[in-house]
Amino acid sequence: NKRQLGGISGFPKMSESEYDSFGTGHSSTSISAALGMAIAADLNGEEGRQSVAVIGDGSMTGGMAFEALNNAGAHKNNLLIILNDNNMAIDPNVGGLNDYLLDVATSKTYNKLKNDVWHILGKFNRISPGMRRFIQNIDNSIKSILLKQSNLFEAMGLRYFGPVDGHDVNHLVKILRDLQKIKGPKLLH
């Protein structure tokens, strides 16, 4: 019944759900809205709060999304952006950003190496913050060596994590819990 006469909206609509914090007609607005909520949380002294934006790869090509990414990197508020890179949109995704995301998501060497490392690390119950930073630095170095381009999101001031298999729910939940502990703007791909 979604998007049918009398059905629910395909976008956030405050009159339909108490969980829709704002109303919109397009999902390219999700990062801007979540960043505004993160800034408001900081101004209100809500230190433990994490604002989350979910955006699809098709919507990521919108100019408003890029403006928000740029501002998120500059403001450094506690924001998690989840990029649902499913290569689905009303029309086919095209352009440089689509090519970039495909390059990141399909680097077989990088993804195999990353999965092997995280599989080994998953056998340890606790990893110290220092060890976590060390591993992240190694991961970033490997990414920059194996991927053709440097990471666009990190160049904009966001910590980048991914790509992650969103169909592996247990692994995804673990990653989301781990990301709660990392302050500042970050993007999960």
Model regions: which residues?
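Cofactor-binding active-site loop characterized by glycine-rich and histidine/acidic residues
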Residues: 1-75
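Residue-level preference for alpha-helix termini and adjacent loops
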Residues: 7-10, 21, 26, 30, ...
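Short beta-strand segments
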Residues: 54-55, 80-84, 189
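A short alpha/beta connector and helix-capping loop motif
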Residues: 62-84, 100-105
